Design a protein with these regions (language model features):
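Active-site-proximal helix-loop elements at catalytic-domain edges
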Residues: 1-10, 163-179
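Conserved small-residue-rich beta-alpha loop and adjacent elements
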Residues: 99-169
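Alpha-helical recognition segments enriched in aromatics with Gly/Pro capping
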Residues: 149, 155-172, 181-193, 203
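Short acidic/polar active-site loop segments enriched in Thr and Asp
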Residues: 37, 147, 177
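N-terminal Rossmann-like NAD(P)+-binding subdomain of aldehyde/semialdehyde dehydrogenases
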Residues: 1-110, 114
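Conserved active-site and cofactor/substrate-binding residues in soluble primary-metabolism enzymes
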Residues: 17, 21-24, 28, 36-39, ...
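Conserved NAD(P)+-binding/catalytic subdomain of aldehyde/semialdehyde dehydrogenases
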Residues: 175-238
Length: 238
């Protein structure tokens, strides 16, 4: 990469990454989910993922989670990766402790560390398999002690609602059972606003396409906490 290419990358704005037309489209989709709930999520999943679902099919059932399988090689790699991420996050957690000082008689200031009450994890799917994202997001939440962890993952495109088994295996390993199959931006809206099936969460995290990024940016306007706009690899590959 030459100096001119690097200069272009460093000067990219939100308009370059997420065009205004796409943000407008995503904003309309979010409003639809806010107003119509499950029906809008199902419509978006049918329109953008080619998968027709009923509202009662949005949540992945316990039998589907239990029956998910990957090859022995992949399974062993996931176990190893989860162990590494868990050990790192446990070390970080153990280094964090509450503290306070008395700045004047009767007045104390300090910090207290506690998990948020709920977290929504968006795991990309569709054309590729991203179990790595599932454990990179899920392990910190589990180690932190977040009481409720909800996962949204798009179903395999043009199928009958199947979800990447690698993601389900990771969730099973982590004890995460609240998993929803839904279009990315619509699923993020559902996690933020809540629907008839999906309860809202306090924070939404997870990487994705420009449409997913736009959804997270737009949700911040409704007071929903989301992750940073883009990870470095997303900025390069978009």
């Amino acid at each position: 990469m030459g100096p001119s290419d690097r200069a272009i990358l460093t000067k990219r704005s939100m308009e370059d990454v997420v065009p205004r037309a796409l943000r407008t489209q995503i904003s309309d989709l979010l409003d639809d989910v806010r107003l119509r709930g499950d029906a809008a999520v199902c419509d978006a999943t049918r329109r953008f993922d080619g998968v027709s679902l009923r509202p009662d099919q949005l949540r992945v059932g316990s039998d589907e989670i239990a029956s998910a399988r990957v090859s022995e090689h992949v399974h062993d790699a996931l176990v190893d990766a989860i162990d590494h991420v868990r050990r790192f996050n446990e070390t970080v957690r153990n280094r964090m402790s509450d503290w306070s000082i008395e700045i004047e008689p009767g007045a104390r200031v300090g910090e207290r560390f506690s998990p948020i009450t709920s977290a929504g994890l968006f795991v990309p799917g569709g054309k590729a398999s991203y179990p790595s994202v599932a454990y990179q997001l899920g392990v910190p939440a589990v180690v932190a002690g977040v009481p409720r962890i909800a996962v949204v993952v798009p179903p395999l495109p043009n199928g009958s609602g199947e979800v990447d088994p690698g993601v389900l295996v990771v969730c099973r390993m982590l004890g995460i059972s609240e998993i929803y199959r839904a279009n990315g931006p619509a699923g993020i809206a559902a996690l933020g606003f809540g629907t008839q099936t999906i309860d809202p969460v306090r924070k939404i995290v997870g990487p994705g396409s420009p449409a997913v990024t736009a959804a997270q940016v737009e949700m911040q306007q409704f007071g929903v906490s989301t992750m940073m706009v883009l990870t470095p690899n997303c900025c390069i590959s978009t």
